[in-house]
Structure formats: structure tokens, C-alpha cells
Amino acid sequence: SIVYDGKVRIVDPYLVGINKKGNEALRAYQVGGYSSSGNLPAWRLYLLKNINSVEILDTSFKIHPQYNPNDKGMARISCRVETA
């Protein structure tokens, strides 16, 4: 889970890198917690500078069928979940 802009969000992290605007970012699939839109689950792009804390939960997740390891929203990918 992450605390983003002061609110807890439960996410499955997939990619970390630099987005198209030049910001360090996390691409994740949000499955719970706060959502201003209320539309969950959903893919989200989180700016690392706005993540206040991270907690590793005792859970796992299956690779989402829409996961793209070559995410077009990222200019450079530093770390990614690998598919089998």
C-alpha cells in the first residue's frame, strides 16, 4: 500500500521510471483504498514525489492481462514486473 497525497491506496506495483513529462513515477493497478473518482480497480500513474510512505503487505497479485511492460506513458522504465 502507499500513502499518496495523504490518503491510503492499495496498489499492485508494475513499473517505476520517468513519465513523458519527465517526472519519476509509479505505474500501478489500484485495487483498494481512497479514490477521488470512486472507480476501482483501475490503472493509475503516481508521481513518486507525492508518495508519502510505502508498506509492503503480506499478499501477492497475479499479472493483470492488460499489463504492458513497455508502457507508452513512460519515457524511461527503471524497474518493471517481468512476465513469465
Region spans (language model):
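Core beta-strand-centered patch of the WYL/Sm-like small regulatory domain
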Residues: 1-84
